Amino acid sequence: MQTVMTNSGVELRVESNIIYTTDSKAFWRSGNMLVGNGTVVSYQCHSMDEAVDMVAALYNGRKTEAAQA
């Protein structure tokens, strides 16, 4: 399981093809679609890494390693 902290303080937990957030939302990949909250976030999502980056962008981006320390 991968975890990513965002600049807005929300933590993303990645399990298989689902991304859970600490504000009780979930996003998942289905083919090349990234779906979350009942809407399509992207039709051109080609990997889970790209999906995590897109979801993190919804929360003002990833917190950098230096900022986490």
Regions found by a protein language model. Give the residues of each.
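N-terminal compositionally biased, intrinsically disordered segments and leader/signal-like regions
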Residues: 4-7, 22-23, 40, 65
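Negatively charged, low-complexity tracts enriched in Asp/Glu with abundant Ser/Thr
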Residues: 1-19
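Mixed-charge, Lys/Arg-enriched low-complexity segments
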Residues: 35-69
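Short aromatic-glycine-(Arg/Gly/Cys) micro-motifs in beta-strand/loop hairpins
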Residues: 18-39
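Short amphipathic alpha-helical segments that mediate assembly, nucleic-acid/protein binding
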Residues: 12, 26, 48-52
